[in-house]
Amino acid sequence: MKHKVKHIHFVGIGGSGMSGIAEVMLNLGYKISGSDIHDSVTTRRLKKLGATVYIGHARTHVESADAVVTSTAILPDNPEVLAARESKVPVVPRAIMLAELLRLRQGIAIAGTHGKTTTTSLITSVLAEAGMDPTFVIGGRLEAAGSHAKLGRGEFIVVEADESDASFLHLQPVLAVVTNIDADHMDTYEHDFGKLKQAFVDFVQHLPFYGMAVLCVDDAHVLEIMPAITKPVTTYGLSETAQVRAADIRHSEGQMHFTALIGVNGKTRKLKIVLNLPGLHNVQNALAAIAVCNEVGLPDVSIVRALADFKGVDRRFQRYGEIPLTDPETGRNGSFTLIDDYGHHPVEMAATIAAARGAFPGRRLVLAFQPHRYTRTRDLFEDFVKVLSTADVLLLTEVYSAGEAPIIAADSKSLARSLRVLGKVEPIFVERVDELEEAIHSIARDKDVVLVMGAGSVGGVAPTLSRDSQVEARLLVSPKENREPAVLLLQGS
């Protein structure tokens, strides 16, 4: 019956989860159309690949569609969704479409509150290095591939498993990774952490009898669910109890060096690893990839090469290079290194700040942060205050609502007041995101680290800052001048 579906329409096609599935379906030969409220790099890429993309939503966009795909970000009263239902065109949740893709290959699904995108990308990179040509659907753009997704010819498909709306329960992979479990998206689970943990148990229990769960034993909540899991398990982490663990860990020039100890059948195999990412959290992500690829049976040389050559993921500690600081009025000069990151949960932010401190020791850390969602700010308010107070300088802009209504005392000004009471850092409130670039230039000094974090519109700050600085440099900076680099870090989960 599947042959009757030829044209698939994606409502919100520019989203990170939707665009990847759309690209794979396009590569499979389906006619793909979609709509989004904004033009973007992603929508333009899909157009070049042959998709029809509309900016804005209208009933006419779905007139010839055989199926319409939506995500939980799309409201039920969306005109395209309403038109599809009235015409009896199937409206398919994104997760179910992803589950259909998993049926075509052997699925490797990565779940967890933090680290999904990087871990998925690392596993994909090792499979590719080993010549396995995997299909992948990732929440961020894999720099080596220049895309969120790719249809490979190999037997494996590697995907992120999204717990935010419990949609990962539709997936039935043969290998399931759980990186960690933390309090986030709690509205989905009726603010019951027990229900969130049970969802992860149910996700793992969907494995076939010949499948394997790969679990991080560094995480207390993962340890708590392990007794309820009846499927085969491989453990990884920094803990000495892990079957795949790391020893002799050290930072060096933005990379992590360690020895991977792989326990198999009572014997331990050692791999010398250079990971082209900073931070202990990325060592954990790499260990997950090593555990999965060891289970698949990939050669050690592919693991070592892929981790050393890893090009990174869009907005995950993404480095934009040296940004000049030139101000003719004050005579200020020098430069900083610009890094963009997607982190927006306090745990992720703490890990990335620690990675920045480790990669660039002794430098002043300027944090520019846009909170994401009023509900998250409310639920994790004290955790945000704690992690934001670890910056040396803090630029704080208003919450990115993601469609939510404002919540009293869950906005950025409330965060700023609490931070002032704590007294560890004096927050500088920047009303609008488009004013952050000027604020950064006014506050940054030579050899600073400026970390800008957030999952919302703050994602446009780093590329704009980099582009504008390059233009300025051509106009104002003599190529003969010798300036030492500093560090600017933009972070967002």
From Swiss-Prot:
Designated name of the protein: UDP-N-acetylmuramate--L-alanine ligase
EC number: 6.3.2.8
PANTHER family in the record: UDP-N-ACETYLMURAMATE--L-ALANINE LIGASE (PTHR43445:SF3), UDP-N-ACETYLMURAMATE--L-ALANINE LIGASE-RELATED (PTHR43445)
Residue sites binding ATP per the record: 112-118
Protein localization: Cytoplasm
UniProt catalytic activity: UDP-N-acetyl-alpha-D-muramate + L-alanine + ATP = UDP-N-acetyl-alpha-D-muramoyl-L-alanine + ADP + phosphate + H(+)
Function: Cell wall formation.
Pathway given in the UniProt record: Cell wall biogenesis; peptidoglycan biosynthesis
Organism expressing this protein natively: Nitrosospira multiformis (strain ATCC 25196 / NCIMB 11849 / C 71)
